[in-house]
C-alpha cells in the first residue's frame, strides 16, 4: 500500500486512460481526482472524486495546478499543465506513458510551441498519431513505476 498522501489527478476531458488509472489507483489504494470542464461520468468508488472545474479555457488546468503538490501525480496530454505540475514538484505523465520531467519539459514546451506555429501557418496539417494499445501498455507501466518511485522516496529515512 502506498502512502495516502499521494493523489492522482487526471486532466479528464479527453483522457483515453481513465479506466487504467482507476485500476492502478485501486491496486495501490490511492485517491483519484478527475477534473474536467463539465460533468463526466466516473465509477462510484470511495477513492474516485469528480470535479467540474468550469467552462473557462484553462479552468480544469488551473484547478489542478492550484492543488497539486510534491508526491502527487498528474495524467495529462496538456504540456503547459504538465510544466506547471513538474515545477510544483509533482510527477506528470502523458496518456501515452511519456513522462514529463524537469529535464525534458523545456524542450517539450518549445517543440509544442513550434508545432502550434507551424500548424497556424499551414506548414503542418496533420495531428498526432492515433492512440495505440502499445501506448496504453506504456502508460500502465509508467504510472505503476511512478507510484512505486514515490512510495520508495517517502519510505526512505530522512
From Swiss-Prot:
InterPro entries annotated for this entry? Answer: UPF0178
Pfam hit, one: DUF188
Its domain of life reads: Bacteria
So what family is this one in?
Answer: Belongs to the UPF0178 family.
PANTHER family the record matches: UPF0178 PROTEIN YAII (PTHR35146:SF1)
User: Which NCBIfam families does the entry link to?
Assistant: PRK00124.1
Protein name (database record): UPF0178 protein Rpal_2485
Tell me what organism the protein belongs to: Rhodopseudomonas palustris (strain TIE-1)
Amino acid at each position: 500500500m502506498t502512502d495516502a498522501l499521494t493523489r492522482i489527478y487526471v486532466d479528464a476531458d479527453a483522457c483515453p486512460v481513465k479506466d487504467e488509472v482507476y485500476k492502478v489507483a485501486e491496486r495501490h489504494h490511492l485517491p483519484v481526482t478527475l477534473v474536467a470542464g463539465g460533468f463526466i461520468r466516473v465509477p462510484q468508488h470511495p477513492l474516485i472524486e469528480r470535479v467540474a472545474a468550469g467552462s473557462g479555457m484553462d479552468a480544469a488546468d488551473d484547478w489542478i495546478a492550484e492543488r497539486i503538490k510534491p508526491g502527487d501525480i498528474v495524467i495529462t496530454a496538456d504540456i503547459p499543465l504538465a510544466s506547471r505540475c513538474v515545477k510544483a514538484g509533482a510527477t506528470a505523465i502523458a496518456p501515452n506513458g511519456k513522462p514529463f520531467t524537469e529535464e525534458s519539459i523545456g524542450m517539450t514546451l518549445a517543440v509544442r510551441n513550434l508545432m502550434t506555429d507551424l500548424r497556424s501557418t499551414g506548414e503542418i496539417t496533420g495531428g498526432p498519431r492515433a492512440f495505440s494499445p502499445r501506448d496504453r501498455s506504456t502508460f500502465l507501466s509508467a504510472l505503476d513505476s511512478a507510484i512505486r518511485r514515490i512510495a520508495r522516496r517517502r519510505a526512505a529515512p530522512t
